[in-house]
A protein has these predicted regions:
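Structural alpha/beta surface segment adjacent to cysteine/selenocysteine redox centers
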Residues: 1-58
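C-terminal cap of thioredoxin/glutaredoxin-like
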Residues: 37, 41-143
């Protein structure tokens, strides 16, 4: 977690005071996505924030069943119901299908943003940590 592509992420984070953890593992997020698909829609933003904090700021392994169930519980999700569907073929296939659809739309990472504006300008999609000058450039292209 502290080398490769995370190096630029950490560098950008330091500039804006992002408290990135000293990552020991880089978790597979399949179970986190299962949680997001299971939970009520009104919990989605709260759960995304909790998962991002767990991964990036606390260095937790959200691929661990107990960790993702704890996050569910702390955020008011029916943990017993979630445990019943966690890792079922149907739940895994649902996430894989959603990921395939996102990939077809050009999503390559999270978070992912789409900025649109003028009718004559094509929407611009981008993912990950983007600094202010890059955002200004993107907005200039579409607004």
């Amino acid at each position: 977690g502290s080398d490769g592509w995370t190096h630029s992420l950490r560098a950008k984070g330091r500039k804006v005071g992002a408290p990135f953890a000293d990552w020991k593992v880089w978790p597979n997020t399949l179970r986190a996505h299962q949680l997001l698909r299971f939970a009520p829609r009104e919990k989605e933003a709260q759960l995304k924030k909790a998962c991002f904090e767990a991964i990036y700021e606390l260095g937790e392994n959200v691929s661990d069943p107990e960790t993702i169930c704890r996050i569910a519980s702390e955020n008011g999700v029916d943990v017993e119901g979630f445990r019943k569907v966690l890792d079922t073929p149907a739940a895994q296939q649902d996430v894989r299908r959603a990921c395939a659809q996102a990939s077809q739309r050009g999503v390559r990472g999270v978070p992912y943003f789409v900025v649109s504006g003028r009718e004559d300008a094509r929407p611009v999609g981008f993912s990950g940590a983007v600094d202010a000058p890059q955002l200004v450039e993107i907005f200039g292209e579409v607004l």
